[in-house]
Amino acid sequence: MSKEKFERNKPHVNVGTIGHVDHGKTTLTAAITNVLAKHFGGKAFAFDQIDKAPEERERGITINTSHVEYDTATRHYAHVDCPGHADYVKNMITGAAQMDGAILVVAATDGPMPQTREHILLGRQVGVPYIIVFMNKCDMVDDEELLELVEMEVRELLSEYDFPGDDLPVVRGSALKALEGEAQWEEKILELAGHLDTYIPEPERAIDLPFLMPIEDVFSIAGRGTVVTGRVERGIVKVGEEVEIVGIKDTTKTTCTGVEMFRKLLDEGRAGENIGALLRGVKREDVERGQVLAKPGTIKPHTKFESEVYVLSKEEGGRHTPFFKGYRPQFYFRTTDVTGTIELPEGVEMVMPGDNIKMVVTLIAPIAMDDGLRFAIREGGRTVGAGVVAKVIA
């Protein structure tokens, strides 16, 4: 046993399997854990350990997801696999499983199928940055030309959705044979792991990104000024730095003159910490929950965007009836609700509970946002949907 296993200082990367039902996503997940456990240490998972995915609730939405982990020589991976198509849709939209990259599983015996396309589209919409293809069940196809054809089809499909279809890695393997321990197919799993290590760049850590903190509360402290509190989402704010207050009202600039945590004064607040930030020359009524504090120039307020939305089913506590164009719910971003109107795609008249749908949203007040921001759709405080900003429009 190499000492590799005990090092916990390896970069951590989040990945997952996507693709059509029965193309072998779960078998591949099991094969990866088994082959890598042999070579790099770690725990091997059996197919049925992964297949019995526990139910999770993310923003009131029921999602079945399996989480496994594995190591390569240079990295530690957390990997998600979902049993059902609906679980993928929910997972990707809510960001319950944020992926730094995805492994698209396509059976060589079938080629791309409807859910293959849908998962690629979802990946594009929700901002999965990298896709690696694993062509599965290649042991069942004798004809080299057929394999070429399937690979070409998959590459074209990925290009259609703006992934670099011509350049991304495609591995031809057999998850089942690898799981059964056949050396030539185990080799293919190692090849896949090599691509995970080299093709998916190391994710930027939250602390290295520009400072942003959603404002949860505003207090005025006699003789000191106005304090805003919240959990720092990313980056670092240092005492004496300029910050912007963005969203809802016109953007204003101020200076952070103090940072405190648990009543202790600090010289900076970092990603993940709950802090109070003292703002120079800001009146209590100038700031409100729902705005964000950010490094100047790094985020802008917007009112109109294209989104991908999952509408909760009745069983999940969602609506019992469909909604139509002209629907005006609240959109909950970070810490606050903003009313908005929706435009449905051409030819879509109504949206049923349990559907996922692309929609354009126009808010009545601007919110600090970038592509990839998650939100909830609410009616009178009850969550009826979850969404992600696919593309800011205005």
UniProtKB/Swiss-Prot annotation:
PROSITE patterns membership: G_TR_1, G_TR_2
InterPro entries reported for this sequence: EF-Tu_GTP-bd, EF-Tu_GTPase, EFTu-like_2, EFTU_2, G_TR_CS, P-loop_NTPase, Small_GTP-bd, T_Tr_GTP-bd_dom
UniProt keyword terms in alphabetical order: Cytoplasm, Elongation factor, GTP-binding, Hydrolase, Magnesium, Metal-binding, Nucleotide-binding, Protein biosynthesis
Compartment list: Cytoplasm
Pfam family, one: GTP_EFTU_D3
Amino-acid positions noted as binding Mg(2+) in the UniProt annotation, renumbered to this chain: T26
Region (G4): 136-139
Region (G3) residue spans: 81-84
EC number of this enzyme: 3.6.5.3
Domain of life of the source: Bacteria
GO CC annotation, single: cytosol
Positions of the UniProt region annotated as G1: 19-26
Region annotated G2, chain positions: 60-64
Residues the entry annotates as binding GTP: 19-26, 81-85, 136-139
HAMAP family, alphabetized: EF_Tu_B (MF_00118_B)
Subunit (UniProt): Monomer.
Sequence similarity: Belongs to the TRAFAC class translation factor GTPase superfamily. Classic translation factor GTPase family. EF-Tu/EF-1A subfamily.
Record function comment: GTP hydrolase that promotes the GTP-dependent binding of aminoacyl-tRNA to the A-site of ribosomes during protein biosynthesis.
Listed PANTHER family: ELONGATION FACTOR TU, MITOCHONDRIAL (PTHR43721:SF22), ELONGATION FACTOR TU-RELATED (PTHR43721)
Name used for this protein in its record: Elongation factor Tu
Naturally occurring in which organism (per UniProt): Aeromonas hydrophila subsp. hydrophila (strain ATCC 7966 / DSM 30187 / BCRC 13018 / CCUG 14551 / JCM 1027 / KCTC 2358 / NCIMB 9240 / NCTC 8049)
